[in-house]
Amino acid sequence: MALGSRWQPPPQLPPLLLLLALAAGVRGLEFGGGPGQWARYARWAGAASTGELSFSLRTNATRALLLYLDDGGDCDFLELLLVDGRLRLRFTLSCAEPATLQLDTPVADDRWHMVLLTRDARRTALAVDGEARAAEVRSKRREMQVASDLFVGGIPPDVRLSALTLSTVKYEPPFRGLLANLKLGERPPALLGSQGLRGAAADPLCAPARNPCANGGLCTVLAPGEVGCDCSHTGFGGKFCSEEEHPMEGPAHLTLNSEVGSLLFSEGGAGRGGAGDVHQPTKGKEEFVATFKGNEFFCYDLSHNPIQSSTDEITLAFRTLQRNGLMLHTGKSADYVNLSLKSGAVWLVINLGSGAFEALVEPVNGKFNDNAWHDVRVTRNLRQHAGIGHAMVNKLHYLVTISVDGILTTTGYTQEDYTMLGSDDFFYIGGSPNTADLPGSPVSNNFMGCLKDVVYKNNDFKLELSRLAKEGDPKMKLQGDLSFRCEDVAALDPVTFESPEAFVALPRWSAKRTGSISLDFRTTEPNGLLLFSQGRRAGAGVGSHSSTQRADYFAMELLDGYLYLLLDMGSGGIKLRASSRKVNDGEWCHVDFQRDGRKGSISVNSRSTPFLATGESEVLDLESELYLGGLPEGGRVDLPLPPEVWTAALRAGYVGCVRDLFIDGRSRDLRGLAEAQGAVGVAPFCSRETLKQCASAPCRNGGICREGWNRFVCDCIGTGFLGRVCEREATVLSYDGSMYMKIMLPTAMHTEAEDVSLRFMSQRAYGLMMATTSRESADTLRLELDGGQMRLTVNLDCLRVGCAPSKGPETLFAGHKLNDNEWHTVRVVRRGKSLQLSVDNVTVEGQMAGAHTRLEFHNIETGIMTERRFISVVPSNFIGHLSGLVFNGQPYMDQCKDGDITYCELNARFGLRAIVADPVTFKSRSSYLALATLQAYASMHLFFQFKTTAPDGLLLFNSGNGNDFIVIELVKGYIHYVFDLGNGPSLMKGNSDKPVNDNQWHNVVVSRDPGNVHTLKIDSRTVTQHSNGARNLDLKGELYIGGLSKNMFSNLPKLVASRDGFQGCLASVDLNGRLPDLIADALHRIGQVERGCDGPSTTCTEESCANQGVCLQQWDGFTCDCTMTSYGGPVCNDPGTTYIFGKGGALITYTWPPNDRPSTRMDRLAVGFSTHQRSAVLVRVDSASGLGDYLQLHIDQGTVGVIFNVGTDDITIDEPNAIVSDGKYHVVRFTRSGGNATLQVDSWPVNERYPAGNFDNERLAIARQRIPYRLGRVVDEWLLDKGRQLTIFNSQAAIKIGGRDQGRPFQGQVSGLYYNGLKVLALAAESDPNVRTEGHLRLVGEGPSVLLSAETTATTLLADMATTIMETTTTMATTTTRRGRSPTMRDSTTQNTDDLLVASAECPSDDEDLEECEPSTGGELILPIITEDSLDPPPVATRSPFVPPPPTFYPFLTGVGATQDTLPPPAARRPSSGGPCQAERDDSDCEEPVEASGFASGEVFDSSLPPTDDEDFYTTFPLVTDRTTLLSPRKPRPNLRTDGATGAPGVLFAPSAPAPNLPAGKMNHRDPLQPLLENPPLGPGVPTAFEPRRPPPLRPGVTSAPGFPRLPTANPTGPGERGPPGAVEVIRESSSTTGMVVGIVAAAALCILILLYAMYKYRNRDEGSYQVDQSRNYISNSAQSNGAVVKEKAPAAPKTPSKAKKNKDKEYYV
């Protein structure tokens, strides 16, 4: 309870109590003050939060302990002492700094004094007699912890010091004197014990059983054995409150003493109980109270009885928690009286026509809005006053007096000329329809709280306004839901906007003609948008021009600590600085805005500033919601924000506290609105932290910390990081001169303030970094490198908008030699006409001329300026790296990468990549190019990259007038720069630490500035030279690149050593900011000069393929298998096809045609991605409807996992150690073989999953029916021993990327997705008919929105569609070959899968023989035979497929052949596809074979077979051989391309002569085989894998086992190419049914024979030789897994059928 809410201490005891005390010679409870004295009362529970303690004391001691309590020795305590004869209170909460109160009233005068102590959360008040003070502690906790009893007069000696929070209290002197009437709240506490006390302590006369006071009177102990009763508030009197009091006659609520027509009151103020005071009502007197909640008021109509008075009196009582509000008003224009509460003080304004008289009454401590009753009295009386001036005569003036609670009085005088108060308007109580418009009103909002007994009286009549309102007088009008009783009106809780993104949306403000807004705010931050609302743009119809559209708007914003008002009613805006000083000082600031038509005022802390809007319009038409604290994120783009509101464009939301918001006089519950809207970052309180937020150094990575409002703000500019604490690495984009990023904004933006920052790194002296461009004007803000300096250009197109033309584009330069290949930070700050350009914290300032300050733009471009319609000189394209582009608070690069925005297009590469732009190869020393003359007269900046193994060669030469020339050459592995400006030739030699002809790329910079300082920089090492004399280089003739004609070398100057041309590669050639296309721009091209750079290396090395690509050795070079890397390109260094999935989700769906749905036993999936999401679905593959098989790659809790089901339970595998939700690029590789799976994230170790075997009772029952009785037991034992696992992913129907259909959409970028030979993203980019896209999707690398010149042509992303094979193999399979056919284009796509495919058109399901098929007759168990389709090139074939080596063999030699006994039949091979050894085995032209060892199951292969990228290809033959024949290298396979393009190298492994196939059930006789393993496998069932962190060294030996990631697939095709699918041993669901009947009969019979033979072989073999393809599920026996050779007999070759009898393969499984 607040101070004064229950008991107000009068200056002295009430007369009755005082007389009783004097008569009895008051002693009370007597404390002798001796050692060991103490009194112990029950715990004061009210001290915890709200409560009161009161007592009377009489003493002459100057220092003593009165009261003490604490929390038992921890933090909280409360101590009341006598110090120097005055009361001193100390207390604290939550270990905060203790608060101290020292009163001035002396109490050591041996008289009685009344003491009241009030607790209210953090605040505690102390009052003695008429003096009251309060203090507050700044603690985290509001409640005081009370654990001890209440000690009075001393501390018991048995209380240990450790149990006292304030240990010094035990040494304070005990109290000496009398203490009476101790109460906690309304009741006395229980005395638990005492020592050294005399008097009534042992005889509690006021105990409930002995209390003599009746009717609720309060019992008071006056002296030992004597009590008194306090009868106030009871309506009774007498000694024991037993006598009923009678009500007074007349106006009972006023007791006034009048004298000669004047209203008098006591000199010291009419306190309670004093003469002329307003008495508290008794029980017999009726109170007239009303509750006002901000929208209620009542008014008395004075039009029939106007007021004309010279003497007035107004009395009322109020109770409120609100700081501001109108209590009473009457009058208009010149005559009025206004009584209001403003900032917790009572404010009186009286105007009698001669100017306003104002009086302010404030309490000494606290405020009047303490929810306690306060009495107000206002009088106006005629008094004689001595005038001051030349007349020096006495004059009559009116004395105006206002008193609050009788003790606070303010007086003043009005002028005599105007003595009458006239009013014929209304008497408003508690508010008005428009408080802001009332004359003289200091507030704009209505009252919230209780008003009681409002009475107006003059010399003619008296108006009891509260009574009239309650009784419903006809002249009294009531507004709102008035309640005629006092109810608690909750205070308008303040709210805190904790971040710039926080805001609260208020209902639309209808203030067309008039309006008012008032609020309080408190902050320490300099900038922020407080209020904003706007209307519909005028002229926004069809055909209207964006720049001419205007919208009404209203805004208040903080800029640099000053408060600004912005207003536009459609005919011109005003921007008014409303505060004369900065208001971000952390203190509450009151703002009051009032408008009437074009006129109005804004008041800041009672300092009013008038304004007059421009134009003729008087109507403010606002359509949007009224936003408080900021703007919604989506609205920032969709709303056409007025450029005059700078904080809106800069996205600088307000951070701080707001309270007491009133709109048109009506309150707004901000806390309730924030909670209802779920406003993020809006807290329902306001407190200011005293601790420095930056003290803990929260900013990481070099970020600069600055203090905000209860927060720290990290400036991450220049760190390369983003985020709240600079914790997230900023996205880096790499540009090669043909790359760009373009942000295409949804609407035209108009701004007058911009904040731009970015980091860059480049070796070129020229290049565009960032530019805003417009489709309709020449407006631009452009940053570019110009001669190694940073150049800022700001152009505002004045001619277009009809403003006064300026002198042209403003230009600022900063920095120098910024092309040093180091990171630099640039920042641009524009505020209207003011410009700032900072480079690496060095700032240059400038001012723009002219009045036009509005910048229009539609795009933000980097790297290349594509919008060129309004520019005469196009800036040079950028080569280098950009990072951390933030434009007006938006990190566009990171948003584009993460998919947060959908309006960006780019082909620049993410990541810090080595940049080699437009390389060309000079294949011989006699090759060269001739370009136009080099322009290098006054200065020069040249840059290029080169790579060579030649030690010497001429790189660049240009002759000139006289002896002028320039030469750059390579001499003995070092760069020489030779020049002559007319003073004779000079030579500068590069100081590289070693020769640069090391076949690595090197960077060369040659420059000459206007000061004639020459610079030669090789990589990071620089040489400079200053030359005197001539300063100009006057060149003419052609510029030769790479060499000269032979006859010109002899004429070169003597310092030039070259006598031959350059052989190697050149790239990124920059000639004074121009990027020539060396091939297209050449005037002459002599010799072999070709695009690209083919290095001299032709053998696989560890560095041959990047990003874990697998190097495949060819006869005349090598290729890289990039399928499981997510990258593409010749060496797996180009990004794969990349899509950005935006907010709201997107989906890419690849659907197999119903006739071509594959079923696989093995799957391979690889994908790259980056995201900040912790939960999303990346890829999902579903089977046909009703089957239920699926495979899903997802992110859960920031980690990657895969779940799949191929007919059994869900099987999961995940990588819990790799967090992928960090926004960085990650690559996931997944393989499945049956129920076994592997998962690898980036370079983390491979995770493996081997589920336990299971069997299906139904399936077993079906199979068991076909088995003879005598074999049943054997089969049962075998099944139980081995366990069966469902392994086939049946009838795959669709691949879905993005997770939108699963309710967990992915947001970010996905790149290079590969699944079983399909590159779905590449197909989507090619608009494949089987691919459907939906949602917010963006292809990275789409062409720019305008055609670019040859200099800016974007490179085409590679669409690597690997040619693969689909095999059909299982442990025991019946396979027949089918007639080969030439695939169509659809086949080349739909058959592009590399896994085991099993299906049967005759059986509805191929799921492990779940469905029964009729058996057929005949057939024997044979091994699977893989055939090759006809090699006739399809109509759109692009290159002949080649067969990579199996992982067991590919590092060995360049050519591997198969033995004669293991070759497939020749029927499926075309003679033209063979090499020179397609003849008999004993052909003398063929090289002798070389023997090499195999691995594991020893599968063999045939190089003439179609290509594959699945390890399954190498494990499909269940043969166990002990030797493989390797052939020496041979010529490549002939090119089968029909389009004339260069084909891939020929077949890597040459086939030997045709031979019959091996017969089923028989094995070749071989000698024992010793494997060439450098390291044995890891153990049973654990195959070896690549080293997890980096690619393995390619050396002879076994580096990988089948079935693991990073295995070779097929040769990637070139851009946009796809090879034919090769042999497709796939059984589709709905192929031709020819021969179905025959097949069913034959297949059924064959099933029985298979089982019989299997059982027989099982009963007659050892464990190490059974022909189960254990590599399928990674469950192998020890002999197979440790490298030992399995001994078997070789089967004989069966006859190869000359003609396929069926056009469809079929398989059946048991």
Curated annotation (Swiss-Prot):
- Ranges facing Extracellular side: 29-1634
Any one of the GO BP annotations: social behavior
Give an example GO cellular component term for this record: protein-containing complex
- Segments spanning the bilayer are 1635-1655
Which residue intervals make up region (Disordered)? 1458-1508, 1587-1621, 1677-1710
Main site of residence? membrane
Residues on the membrane's Cytoplasmic side span 1656-1710
Residues where Ca(2+) 3 binds: D1189, V1206, I1288, N1290
Q: Specify which residues bind Ca(2+) 1 according to the UniProt entry for this protein.
A: D335, L352, M420
What is the membrane topology here? Single-pass type I membrane protein
- Glycosylated where? N60, N338, N841, S1400
Q: Does the keyword RNA-binding apply?
A: no
Positions of disulphide bridges: C206-C219, C213-C229, C231-C241, C450-C486, C657-C686, C694-C705, C699-C714, C716-C726, C1065-C1093, C1100-C1111, C1105-C1120, C1122-C1132
- Annotated EGF-like domain ranges read 202-242, 690-727, 1096-1133
UniProt entry tagged with the keyword Protein biosynthesis:
no
Any Pfam family: Laminin_G_2
Xref: SUPFAM superfamilies: Concanavalin A-like lectins/glucanases
Changes after translation: O-glycosylated; contains heparan sulfate. Heparan sulfate attachment is required for synapse development by mediating interactions with neuroligins.
Question: Any idea which positions bind Ca(2+) 2?
Answer: D779, L796, R854
Protein origin, superkingdom: Eukaryota
- Signal peptide (residue range): 1-28
Q: What does this protein do?
A: Neuronal cell surface protein that may be involved in cell recognition and cell adhesion. May mediate intracellular signaling.
Q: Which PANTHER family match?
A: AXOTACTIN, PIKACHURIN-LIKE PROTEIN
Assembly and partners?
The laminin G-like domain 1 binds to NXPH1. Interacts with PATJ. Interacts with CBLN1, CBLN2 and, less avidly, with CBLN4. Specific isoforms bind neuroligins NLGN1, NLGN2 and NLGN3. Specific isoforms bind to alpha-dystroglycan. Interacts (via Laminin G-like 1 domain) with IGSF21 (Ig-like 1 domain) in a trans-interaction manner. Interacts with CLSTN3.
Under what name is this protein listed? Neurexin-2
